[in-house]
């Protein structure tokens, strides 16, 4: 029984998910159905939390839109998500960046992680 569940979970997992973590700036392209038409909607922001649970993995992205903070939680392996693109790597010392909710402006900035070659 356990093997069947494990096999079904692996079957439903996406393989094209990039490696990212808290502090990274990502662009999530989401399929949106309006009327009878389907289009892609981009949501760009900072990953403030990531939850790794196999098929049930999720992450939360926060952005500032018109001076108002907007957060959206995504299921990593959801069929609604078309693609995830990492724009910028962030250098942070926490796994969950919930403290960014109280901050705005320069205090909400995240240092960039410079890649070593």
Swiss-Prot record:
Cited PROSITE patterns: RIBOSOMAL_L19 (PS01015)
Q: Which Pfam families match?
A: Ribosomal_L19
Q: Which residues cross the membrane?
A: none
Q: Which UniProt keywords apply?
A: Ribonucleoprotein, Ribosomal protein
Q: Name one GO biological process term.
A: translation
Gene Ontology CC terms, in alphabetical order: cytosolic large ribosomal subunit
Q: Which InterPro entries match?
A: Ribosomal_bL19 (IPR001857), Ribosomal_bL19_CS (IPR018257), Ribosomal_bL19_sf (IPR038657), Translation_prot_SH3-like_sf (IPR008991)
In alphabetical order, the GO MF annotations are: structural constituent of ribosome
The organism's superkingdom is given as Bacteria
Task: Sum up the protein's function in the record's words.
Answer: This protein is located at the 30S-50S ribosomal subunit interface and may play a role in the structure and function of the aminoacyl-tRNA binding site.
Name the protein family: Belongs to the bacterial ribosomal protein bL19 family.
Q: What is this protein called?
A: Large ribosomal subunit protein bL19
Which species is this record about?
A: Shewanella piezotolerans (strain WP3 / JCM 13877)
């Amino acid at each position: 029984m356990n093997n069947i569940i494990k096999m079904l979970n692996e079957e439903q997992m996406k393989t094209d998910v990039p490696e990212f973590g808290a502090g990274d700036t990502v662009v999530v392209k989401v399929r949106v159905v309006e009327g009878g038409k389907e289009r892609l909607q981009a949501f760009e922001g900072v990953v403030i939390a990531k939850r790794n649970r196999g098929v049930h993995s999720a992450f939360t992205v926060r952005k500032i839109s018109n001076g108002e903070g907007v957060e959206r939680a995504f299921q990593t392996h959801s069929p609604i998500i078309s693609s995830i693109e990492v724009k910028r790597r962030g250098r942070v010392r926490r796994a969950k960046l919930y403290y960014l909710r109280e901050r705005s402006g320069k205090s909400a900035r995240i240092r960039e992680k410079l890649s070593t070659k």
